Amino acid sequence: MRVYSLPQLTVPQLAAIAPHSGLLPWDRAQFSYIDQSRRLAELIQIQMAQRFRGTTDTPFEAPVRQLRTVAAPAVAIEVSSVSVADRSSLDQMGPGLADGVARAVAAFRTIY
């Protein structure tokens, strides 16, 4: 189980992508929320580590294209296993996944 947020940008990188027209380009919508997204990813990853054996408690950073267009705190969650021959065991993770995400979002709402 992996939770992803976008990588942190440096000040020169932010200046290079700042819109000049005052309009927000869709591919840059997430940049104002990177810190909040990272915190949300941390909370969700901790919940996943508590529920699923072998899951790290540290979230990952990756340039996930779909996250760049979200103008709010956002993460991507990857559910997969290379050692599971039968997908039904992954399907059984659903309730634990949903509960963990719900608890993390509830905790995040108190700090957002």
Predicted segments, located by residue:
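Active-site-proximal helix/loop segments of hydrolytic enzymes
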Residues: M1-Y112
